[in-house]
Amino acid sequence: MEFGLLGEAEARSPALSLSDAGTPHPPLPEHGCKGQEHSDSEKASASLPGGSPEDGSLKKKQRRQRTHFTSQQLQELEATFQRNRYPDMSTREEIAVWTNLTEARVRVWFKNRRAKWRKRERSQQAELCKGGFAAPLGGLVPPYEEVYPGYSYGNWPPKALAPPLAAKTFPFAFNSVNVGPLASQPVFSPPSSIAASMVPSAAAAPGTVPGPGALQGLGGAPPGLAPAAVSSGAVSCPYASAAAAAAAAASSPYVYRDPCNSSLASLRLKAKQHASFSYPAVPGPPPAANLSPCQYAVERPV
């Protein structure tokens, strides 16, 4: 009897039936409920005017309206943008108060304005890179052929020994030994070199007598000397030999000359010549007639 009652109870309530382990089985889902849910969602979507749930979700989103700025607002915003392209929060709030706008609108305007400014800068740089700097500078710099017509690059003869510069004439002449006219002269020239530069070339040779034109080039003869004395003095002048030796030494570029030794030698030579050259004695005053300092020659009337 008891087993029969248990079988009837299990048949009436299958959810309360126990398994062999003693755990209750979950109730099986009914297919009729799922179909009912799908039918309810289809009815709801059909009742919407768009006909699909996606259109309904798009309409539920709030669309942002486009802000229309007045000329005064744009002028104020542009002036502030020229002064500061990245305003902070307090500055944006002040601008919003001045322009009667919200801080969010001001922030968005500055963001868009910065993007526009960067785009313009990039386009200008791209134009400069495409055009390059050769076009504006091409009219300023003349071509190479017009600047240097005589120096055609790459057109030299194949067996030419001298470049085109050798055919050009220059106002100054180059020497193979002395490059410059003053290269052979020392920085501190001794008196011998100065005397050699002042003596004419005709007086450099010891056996020649310079003419009157050469003497006039030296400043003329002294006023107390006769022309004959002048002409003879050119040969017997004590400075002629020293000048000739200095000129001969200066004319030879292969002789090493020490400026200190040459100056000392010239000074010694001049001292010897001054010692040999004697001047006439100057006559002194006539001697007194044996008179003491306290005695005076007084003429007495006769």
Curated annotation (Swiss-Prot):
Keywords: Activator, Developmental protein, DNA-binding, Homeobox, Nucleus, Phosphoprotein, Transcription, Transcription regulation. GO terms for molecular function: DNA-binding transcription activator activity, RNA polymerase II-specific; RNA polymerase II cis-regulatory region sequence-specific DNA binding. Gene3D superfamilies: Homeodomain-like. The modification Phosphoserine is found at S52, S57. SUPFAM superfamilies: Homeodomain-like. Residues 1-71 are annotated as: Disordered. Disruption phenotype: Mice show loss of nascent substantia nigra dopaminergic neurons at the beginning of their final differentiation and a loss of tyrosine hydroxylase (TH) expression specifically in the substantia nigra neurons. A motif (Nuclear localization signal) lies at residues 268-272. Its main location: nucleus. Transcriptional regulator which is important for the differentiation and maintenance of meso-diencephalic dopaminergic (mdDA) neurons during development. In addition to its importance during development, it also has roles in the long-term survival and maintenance of the mdDA neurons. Activates NR4A2/NURR1-mediated transcription of genes such as SLC6A3, SLC18A2, TH and DRD2 which are essential for development of mdDA neurons. This is Pituitary homeobox 3. It comes from Mus musculus. The gene is Pitx3.
